[in-house]
């Protein structure tokens, strides 16, 4: 889940300068005949001296403002003016949370008057930065109830800003979209889909306003669409993005992944033809990316093999996997050799599967599991003499996923070859594993009876 993308600190540091100029111009406005009273005007030099000190004496500046606030009417221009100066102090200190209260109060005082204390430009700037302050506090707190409250305030402030702003801009729309998304995801276990839809609407407005839209617009829209499970729209957007920016590897990866997601959804609903279609689209996306020089990692190459295998294109899967293992384009891992063998088995080429497993044992000479896979392949071909050698090699090497299976397999194979002593020993070993107790015990009893009968017959003769 993305976090707020904007840098509040840089913007808010600039606000102090903006407000200093804005407040100074208030008294000069032709429509507004407001100015500080004498008591405020006479005390301001002390405030300025504290702020101009190197470093600024913030405690002294705040003390001067607090003293003045106690002396002026609560609804006066002086109060609004002093609140503006106070929020400047907090902003310069980096105390952004503390700047919220004087900003809110000064706006309330201004808008209660006609004409307002602050002109339209300053009012818009104050609301816009108030949005960002709320947003920052919401994003930083771990208290979800408090976060929800700040997000709601930020949303309302942004709605008001849009109402009083003649023309919005792309950056503002991005902030609003991020705000709505973050608000919608306060409860990640139960996201607010209506807020996510609103976030998409604001992204779309921003995209129309931007000459060269930031990637953040697209990232945010994709996250919202995916959260809403509107995967077809995500795929459509990503198709546009890879054409617009074919050198962006992240877009190629997301495109291939979204097609797989859609395929999985159709698979769940048993719409197998559609599932196959979107698996193929994922394959094509990966191959397009590789043509552009992306998605060539061993993991990407393995994923491509996996998709081919899942849609029963075993010949292509085997071709890519064999070549990948040979050229190190796919990780040299025992499981991958097993998958290669399985691909050949699906193609009714068991001997090639066995050869693949034997190649795997050359790469992993200590892997008992690969030896056991070879043994099973020979068993399926009704070649117990070959099978038993590899079962015994598998047990000797160890590293088996399910050792009891190897012992039971040895017991049955040895029995078929009338090597009863070997079979009995293997059956007894199988009982040492919880999963092998039942079959191992039954096999042991049968073999013991057989050997006993054989011994009795021998003695009688």
Predicted regions and their residues:
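Start-of-helix register in tetratricopeptide repeats
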Residues: 44, 81, 125, 171, ...
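Structural register within alpha-helical repeat arrays
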Residues: 46-49, 86, 130, 137, ...
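N-terminal leader/linker segments that initiate helical-solenoid repeat arrays
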Residues: 12, 17-132, 136-139, 144-152, ...
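Structural motif corresponding to the intra-repeat A-B loop/turn of tetratricopeptide repeats
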Residues: 55, 93, 137, 141, ...
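Flexible helix-coil transition and linker loops at the boundaries of alpha-helical arrays
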Residues: 32-33, 69-79, 108-123, 160-170, ...
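Alpha-helical adaptor scaffolds
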Residues: 334-348, 355-361, 365-404
